[in-house]
C-alpha cells in the first residue's frame, strides 16, 4: 500500500498528486492537494456498454464535506444533504472540458466523484478538483484524449496573476478559469470588471500557457502509475445503411433546413425520420431505429455546416454576423418593482426585478463559513419554452449554470450597498427558446433593473457566438440558433457594456481553436453587442428616476454605535414596538447605520423621529414630555426621549404636600418634566414643579377632612 506521489510547483502553490493507497477498487483514484486544500477524486468506468445505450453517460459529482474545514454541518440532521448551488456549478466546471475528450461512439458509463476532504481558506477547491479529475481519468486507462490542465487567472494592478488566493481575488478585476489540453483551450468561465476584448483574450492565452506544467506532470504521473490503455475501437460504420438513409433523406433534409421557422422545421425533420424508419424497418426488421436517427443527425450536421462554410445563408436566412430581430417591452407587470420582456428572434425572456431589505439577503453556508449575498439571480427554463411537456420542480444543473452566467454578466454594473441599500433579486423566465437564452436573460435583467430604478453603472447586453470549422476553413457565427449550437464546434458567450466585457463563457468541442479564431469571435461579438445595446438604450436609456410605488423605500440614518442597545431595547422590546406601530422594517449595522424600509414615507419619518429621540442626550434644565412608567412610594419614574427613565421624587411633583404619589400620577400618564441633575451613574433626577401639568388630585374632600381630624 505504498502510494505513488507526484509533487510540483504551480505558480506560488505546491500541487501534490497521490494514488495507490485509497479506493483501490475504483478504476482510478487520486488525492489531489494544493497547499492543504485536498480533493479526493475517484473514477469508475464500466467495461461493458448497457444494452440499447446510444449516448455517453458521464456523471460528475462534486461534494464538499464540512469536516474539511473543521466544522459540523448545521440543520437538524447534522449531515450534508443535496448539492448546494456552488457544488453544482463546480461539478459542471469539471464536466465541461473533459466531456469533448472522449471519442465519438464511446458509450461506457463513467462516474467521477470529487470529494473535498481538507480546505485551506485561501485556496479554492474547484481548481484542485479539476486537476484531480484530469489525473484520475488519465490514470484509469479509459479512452480519454487528455490530460487537461486548469488555471485561474486574476488581474491585479494591470498584471495577470496565476491562481490568486481568496484574499488576492478580492482585489482582482478578473476571475477567469481556463482549461485545455497541451494543444488547445477547451473551456473558459469568467467574470470581469469591464475589461477589453484584448485583455480577456490575453488572460485566456496566459492561463493556457501557464497550465502546461500541470499537463506535463500528469503525463509523468501516468507513466509511473497509469493503468494499461483500454483496447477500445469504435463500431464499424454500416456503409450500406448510411447509403440507404442518404438516398431517402439527404435531399429532403436540405429542403427542411430552408424552413426558417423552428417548429415547422422540426415537424418536417420528424416527418422525414418517421418515413425513413418506416421504409427501412419494413425492408429489414433487424435495423435499429437509433442507428437510422444517428445517420439522419449526421446528415443534418453535414447540410448545415456545408452551407455555412460555402458562404450560403444560415438556417434562418441570416448572414454570419447578423443578429436576429429584437423586440423590447419594459414595465410589463403592473405590481412588480421592475419588469421587461426581451425578445431576440425565437428566444424570449421575461425578467423581473424585486427590491428587498438586508434581511432578504441570501445567507450562503460555505466551507469557510457563512457569507451574505445581496444580489440574487434565478433562471427558469420551463418545458413550454421549447414547445414540450415535462416535469416542473427544483432547478436543474443547466438552470443553475445559466443563472450564474447571467448573474456574472450583470454583477459588474451593480451599485454598492452604500450607493443603493437594497437587496436585489432578478428572476428570468424563459418563455421561448431557440438559442442563447442565458444571454437574453442578461439583456432582460439589465432592462428590468433599470425599470425598477436600480442605478446600474451601464446597460449590459449579451450575445452567443458559434463556430463551424473544417480543416483550416472556419466561419464565426453571431447570435447562434439552438441548431447551430448543437451542430457547431463552439459555444462562445460574451456579456458586457459599451466599455468592455463583464462575463465570458466558452465551450469548445474540437481541438485547434487558435487565439486568432478567438480574437475574431470576440471582435465580432463586440459588434453584435453594440447593436443590441443601441436597441436597448432606445427602449430605456437610463434607470428610472423613481422606484415603483410598490417597492419599499429605504431611509438611512446614522447613530452612535454606543446607542444601538438603546434603540433595540431590552430583549428587542423597543425596536419591536417601533416596527409593529409603524409597519416598517428596521435594520441596524454594527457601525450605527440604521436602515428603515417602508412603503409609507410618513411612517418612515415617524420612526426616524422616534429613533432621534431615543439616541438624543438628556440635557440638564431641558424640559421634556414623558410618560409615567412606574409609581413607587417615594415618587414616580418617567420615561423621556423614547426610553430613558428619570425619577420625579415625591417632593418634586407639586408645591403642595403629597401624601401618596398615586393620588397625582398613574402609569401611562403624560407629564412635562424638567431635568434637575444627571449623577455620575447617569441617573436622571426630574422635577414637575413650576410646569404646566394640570395635575388633579384623586383625594376626595371627605378624605382630607378625615385626615385633618385624625391629626387633631
Curated annotation (Swiss-Prot):
Its EC number is 2.7.7.8. Disulfide bonds: none annotated. GO terms for molecular function: 3'-5'-RNA exonuclease activity; magnesium ion binding; polyribonucleotide nucleotidyltransferase activity; RNA binding. One of its GO terms (biological process) is RNA processing. Keywords: Cytoplasm, Magnesium, Metal-binding, Nucleotidyltransferase, RNA-binding, Transferase. Residues 552-611 form the KH domain. One of its GO terms (cellular component) is cytosol. Involved in mRNA degradation. Catalyzes the phosphorolysis of single-stranded polyribonucleotides processively in the 3'- to 5'-direction. Belongs to the polyribonucleotide nucleotidyltransferase family. PANTHER family: POLYRIBONUCLEOTIDE NUCLEOTIDYLTRANSFERASE, POLYRIBONUCLEOTIDE NUCLEOTIDYLTRANSFERASE 1, MITOCHONDRIAL. Component of the RNA degradosome, which is a multiprotein complex involved in RNA processing and mRNA degradation. This is Polyribonucleotide nucleotidyltransferase. It comes from Haemophilus ducreyi (strain 35000HP / ATCC 700724).
Amino acid at each position: 500500500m505504498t502510494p505513488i506521489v507526484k509533487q510540483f510547483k504551480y505558480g506560488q502553490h505546491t500541487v501534490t498528486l497521490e494514488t495507490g493507497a485509497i479506493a483501490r477498487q475504483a478504476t482510478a483514484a487520486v488525492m489531489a492537494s494544493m497547499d492543504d486544500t485536498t480533493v479526493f477524486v475517484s473514477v469508475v468506468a464500466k467495461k461493458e456498454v448497457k444494452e440499447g445505450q446510444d449516448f455517453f453517460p458521464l456523471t460528475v459529482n462534486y461534494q464538499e464535506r464540512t469536516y474539511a474545514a473543521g466544522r459540523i454541518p448545521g440543520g437538524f440532521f447534522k449531515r450534508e444533504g443535496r448539492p448546494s448551488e456552488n457544488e453544482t456549478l463546480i461539478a459542471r466546471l469539471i464536466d465541461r472540458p473533459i466531456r469533448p475528450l472522449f471519442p465519438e461512439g464511446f458509450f461506457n458509463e463513467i462516474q467521477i466523484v470529487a470529494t473535498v476532504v481538507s480546505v485551506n481558506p485561501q485556496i479554492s477547491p474547484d481548481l484542485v478538483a479539476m486537476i484531480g479529475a484530469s489525473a484520475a481519468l488519465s490514470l484509469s486507462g479509459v479512452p480519454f484524449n487528455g490530460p487537461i490542465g486548469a488555471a485561474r487567472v486574476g488581474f491585479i494592478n494591470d498584471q495577470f496573476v496565476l491562481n490568486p488566493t481568496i484574499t488576492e481575488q478580492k482585489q482582482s478585476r478578473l476571475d477567469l478559469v481556463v482549461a485545455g489540453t497541451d494543444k488547445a483551450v477547451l473551456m473558459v468561465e469568467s467574470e470581469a470588471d469591464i475589461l477589453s476584448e484584448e485583455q480577456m483574450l490575453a488572460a485566456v492565452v496566459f492561463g493556457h500557457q501557464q497550465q502546461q506544467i500541470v499537463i506535463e506532470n500528469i503525463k509523468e504521473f501516468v507513466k509511473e502509475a497509469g493503468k494499461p490503455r483500454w483496447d477500445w475501437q469504435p463500431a464499424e460504420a454500416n456503409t450500406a445503411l448510411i447509403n440507404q438513409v442518404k438516398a431517402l433523406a439527404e435531399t429532403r433534409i436540405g429542403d427542411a433546413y430552408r424552413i426558417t421557422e423552428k417548429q415547422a422545421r422540426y415537424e418536417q425533420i420528424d416527418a422525414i425520420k418517421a418515413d425513413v424508419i418506416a421504409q427501412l424497418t419494413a425492408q429489414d426488421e433487424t435495423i435499429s431505429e437509433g442507428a437510422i436517427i444517428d445517420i439522419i443527425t449526421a446528415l443534418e450536421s453535414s447540410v448545415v455546416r456545408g452551407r455555412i462554410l460555402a458562404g450560403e445563408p444560415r438556417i434562418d436566412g441570416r448572414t454570419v454576423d447578423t443578429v436576429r430581430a429584437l423586440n423590447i417591452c419594459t414595465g410589463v407587470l403592473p405590481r412588480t418593482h421592475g419588469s421587461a420582456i426581451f425578445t431576440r428572434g425565437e428566444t424570449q425572456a421575461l425578467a423581473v426585478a424585486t427590491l428587498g431589505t438586508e434581511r432578504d439577503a441570501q445567507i450562503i453556508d460555505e466551507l469557510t463559513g457563512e457569507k451574505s449575498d445581496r444580489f440574487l439571480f434565478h433562471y427558469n427554463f420551463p418545458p413550454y419554452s421549447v414547445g414540450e411537456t415535462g416535469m416542473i420542480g427544483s432547478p436543474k444543473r443547466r438552470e443553475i449554470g445559466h443563472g450564474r452566467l447571467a448573474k456574472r454578466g450583470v454583477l459588474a454594473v451593480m451599485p454598492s450597498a452604500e450607493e443603493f441599500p437594497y437587496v436585489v433579486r432578478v428572476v428570468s423566465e424563459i418563455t421561448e427558446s431557440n438559442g442563447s437564452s442565458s444571454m437574453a436573460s442578461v439583456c432582460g435583467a439589465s432592462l428590468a433593473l433599470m425599470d425598477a430604478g436600480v442605478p446600474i453603472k451601464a446597460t449590459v447586453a449579451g450575445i452567443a457566438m458559434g463556430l463551424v470549422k473544417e480543416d483550416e476553413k472556419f466561419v464565426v457565427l453571431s447570435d447562434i440558433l439552438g441548431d447551430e449550437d448543437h451542430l457547431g464546434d463552439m459555444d462562445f458567450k460574451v456579456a458586457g457594456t459599451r466599455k468592455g466585457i463583464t462575463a465570458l463563457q466558452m465551450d469548445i468541442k474540437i481541438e485547434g481553436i487558435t487565439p486568432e479564431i478567438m480574437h475574431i469571435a470576440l471582435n465580432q461579438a463586440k459588434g453584435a453587442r453594440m447593436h443590441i445595446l443601441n436597441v436597448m438604450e432606445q427602449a430605456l436609456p437610463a434607470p428610472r428616476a423613481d422606484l415603483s410605488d410598490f417597492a419599499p423605500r429605504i431611509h438611512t440614518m446614522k447613530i452612535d454605535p454606543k446607542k444601538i442597545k438603546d434603540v433595540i431595547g431590552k430583549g428587542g422590546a423597543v425596536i419591536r414596538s417601533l416596527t409593529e406601530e409603524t409597519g416598517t422594517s428596521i435594520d441596524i449595522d454594527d457601525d450605527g447605520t440604521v436602515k428603515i424600509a417602508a412603503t409609507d414615507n410618513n411612517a418612515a419619518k415617524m420612526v426616524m423621529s422616534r429613533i432621534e429621540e431615543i439616541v438624543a442626550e438628556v440635557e440638564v434644565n431641558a424640559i421634556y414630555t414623558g410618560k409615567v412608567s412606574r409609581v413607587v412610594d417615594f415618587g414616580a419614574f418617567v420615561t423621556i426621549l423614547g426610553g430613558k427613565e428619570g425619577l420625579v421624587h415625591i417632593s418634586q411633583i407639586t408645591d403642595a404636600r403629597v401624601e401618596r404619589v398615586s393620588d397625582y400620577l398613574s402609569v401611562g400618564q403624560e407629564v412635562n418634566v424638567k431635568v434637575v441633575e444627571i449623577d455620575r451613574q447617569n441617573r436622571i433626577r426630574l422635577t414637575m414643579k413650576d410646569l404646566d401639568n394640570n395635575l388633579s388630585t384623586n383625594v376626595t374632600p371627605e378624605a382630607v377632612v378625615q385626615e385633618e381630624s385624625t391629626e387633631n
